[in-house]
Amino acid sequence: MNKPKIFIDGEAGTTGLQIYSRLNERDDIELVSIAASKRKDADERAKLLNSVDVAILCLPDDAAREAVSLVHSSQVKILDASTAYRTAQGWVYGFPELNPGQREKIANAQFVSNPGCYPTGFLACVRPLIAQGILPSSFPITINAVSGYSGGGKSLIQKYDSFHEQQKGATSDYPFGIYGLQFGHKHVKEMHQHSGLASPPLFIPAVGDFEQGMLVQIPLPLWTLDNPPSGEEIHQAIAQYYQGEKFVQVASFKDPSLLRDGTFLDATAVNGTNIVQVFVFANDNTKEALLVARLDNLGKGASGAAVQNLNIMLGLPEELGL
């Protein structure tokens, strides 16, 4: 039996390198690579793109669109890691745990878009509550999130690594900073479309002086609702939604042992995995709650999710290589 052929277009980038590393040791697939001197040769890329079973695109948005235009074979499946097609018609959103039946859609699709890191954490928290009517679709959602600097790609990684090397590991001039202050972050559209919310969420991302890891925080002012759910009801709804899932873990409710020193929720605790953890914190007296997702921005937020989707697209056990 022939092994499925996989081509990573953009394997030299941050996400591409991570995916290559996860796939390179596997003996159930065949990785096809392009010579470094041919990476910008459209004819050579088109030849490879049309000769494989699955092409994984790890490219900027415009380059991803160009790559898709080069594929003429209906036998080639495409998994795109850019933001170009995450809300596009004809593309299946590659978050297997998003809805019942999402895996089947991914398995049967020719075109699959890999989710963004922030949306993965956000949707893992919010989608179950909207889908089950625990929160109304009109609920005003705010997101505060922080990612390690690897989320900024090679240029930001080099900036931080250079400073750490010069200062022998000292904290950089940018220990923490918020951005996206024009409220036009590229992830908002997919957050809105795939959550079921009536209006886009207000999203404030940040970067911290640590390489990998992510916390996505969603405060819920439940006092704005006529009949607000309790913290336990929120936790129960999310836990039931993900019952039996391998890669979405819902933390125990009110368990201080999950916090570092009983106080802090560490952004880096699941680095190197394809897991997103969901936490629910609540005070029923004040009718306030906080949802938090913790994930590796390069794992379930990027390359891990891509490998999971690839496995589903090939009809393989989705935990292979993870």
Curated annotation (Swiss-Prot):
Keywords: Amino-acid biosynthesis, Arginine biosynthesis, Cytoplasm, NADP, Oxidoreductase. PROSITE patterns: ARGC (PS01224). It is an enzyme of class 1 (oxidoreductase). SMART domains: Semialdhyde_dh. One of its GO terms (cellular component) is cytoplasm. SUPFAM superfamilies: Glyceraldehyde-3-phosphate dehydrogenase-like, C-terminal domain, NAD(P)-binding Rossmann-fold domains. The keyword NADP applies. Its main location: cytoplasm. Pathway: Amino-acid biosynthesis; L-arginine biosynthesis; N(2)-acetyl-L-ornithine from L-glutamate: step 3/4. Its EC number is 1.2.1.38. Gene3D superfamilies: Dihydrodipicolinate Reductase, domain 2, NAD(P)-binding Rossmann-like Domain. GO terms for biological process: L-arginine biosynthetic process. It catalyses: N-acetyl-L-glutamate 5-semialdehyde + phosphate + NADP(+) = N-acetyl-L-glutamyl 5-phosphate + NADPH + H(+). InterPro entries: AGPR_AS, AGPR_type-2, NAD(P)-bd_dom_sf, NAGSA_dehydrogenase, Semialdehyde_DH_NAD-bd. Catalyzes the NADPH-dependent reduction of N-acetyl-5-glutamyl phosphate to yield N-acetyl-L-glutamate 5-semialdehyde. Belongs to the NAGSA dehydrogenase family. Type 2 subfamily. This is N-acetyl-gamma-glutamyl-phosphate reductase. It comes from Trichormus variabilis (strain ATCC 29413 / PCC 7937).
